[in-house]
């Protein structure tokens, strides 16, 4: 059975009170999570240290920290940015890059995202590379070529070996926050295509790499996705803001793993 990763992206949401309450519920209600499930939270960067301190105080060994963004520089006169080395200093393990909202609202292109990927690997953090097509690209049948372009920009800069200990998150832009998810069968076919494409460069990396799905994941559909052969976890956005939903998604995944290993 494959490992599963569940990443909760809280985006620009929450405050000290709501985040603290969410963490209390998470750390007290999540028990006996199998080692094959990896869980991470991506709070607003301002609250990363607070989240870290809470997890430490509860002697948490289950939930890791994820950053929603990173700069391409490690230090310097770059007002408002945060470096990979700073994130590492705060015990962050994962970093999201290439998310469609960063591509759309902050005009981040493949070249910049590749530079972020490079600096994350240099700092020995784990990149979560988000790739996927928008509605127009989907309607024109360009899904595969768009995914190839986004992956190739990384390979061109740092080589295929940099995909070791990396997560790819396929997130069709048209499905994010829309309440309309892609079908599990369609997502499986795209994940299989991504894995096969990477295998053209390195079969070992292709077999080992974790490929998540992100796009209107809910408690009602999560099992339909994670039971697909090439879907190795989920990147959960709006559904994770209700901590009850996030706990249920984790428990559903956990129970599936436990049944598999019984």
Swiss-Prot record:
Coiled coil: none
Catalytic activity of the protein: D-glyceraldehyde 3-phosphate = dihydroxyacetone phosphate
Binding site for substrate: 9-11, 177, 216
Annotated pathway: Carbohydrate biosynthesis; gluconeogenesis; Carbohydrate degradation; glycolysis; D-glyceraldehyde 3-phosphate from glycerone phosphate: step 1/1
GO BP: any one term: glycerol catabolic process
Keyword annotations from UniProtKB, A to Z: Cytoplasm, Gluconeogenesis, Glycolysis, Isomerase
Source domain of life: Bacteria
Any Pfam family hit: TIM
Main subcellular localisation: cytoplasm
An example molecular function term from Gene Ontology annotations: triose-phosphate isomerase activity
Active site as annotated: 99, 171
Subunit note: Homodimer.
Record-stated family: Belongs to the triosephosphate isomerase family.
Protein name: Triosephosphate isomerase
The organism's taxonomic lineage, starting at the top: Bacteria, Pseudomonadati, Pseudomonadota, Gammaproteobacteria, Enterobacterales
